[in-house]
Amino acid sequence: MRFLSRIVLAAALVLVAPAFAQAPKKDVASPALQKEFDGFIGKFRAALKANDSAAVAGMTRLPFMNDGSIRDAAQFHEKIYKREFTAKKRACIQRGKAVYDRDGENNDNYFVFCGDLIFVFTKTPAGFLFTEVGVND
């Protein structure tokens, strides 16, 4: 009976082990990447605190979200900044924790969640840039 119990226990462990072995690893930013992002987000937050849409646009990949109608700082201010960077959302980004993840295209991204929106910052050849605002679903 003892032998049978051990076999059943071993079989159960063999069946459960792959679930633990295949658990997805959480991406972690390298210290150098984290340092680079910390420098960027500090400047971005300072621009938000000053309500400086031109400075924010300077740290944004344009055309914004590949929308040809948002190609420069003036268009960004009118179509994105006024709507998405309210005082409440600016305050949220200033105090919100940025979460790192690497996407399917191997891009390094940080996300700041503010209520129903996600603000996305992506590492580009030019350094980090604000690249997207989307719905937090």
List the model feature ranges, each with a label.
Residues 12-20:
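Hydrophobic h-region of N-terminal signal peptides that target proteins for export
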Residues 23-49, 53, 57-137:
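C-terminal-biased regions
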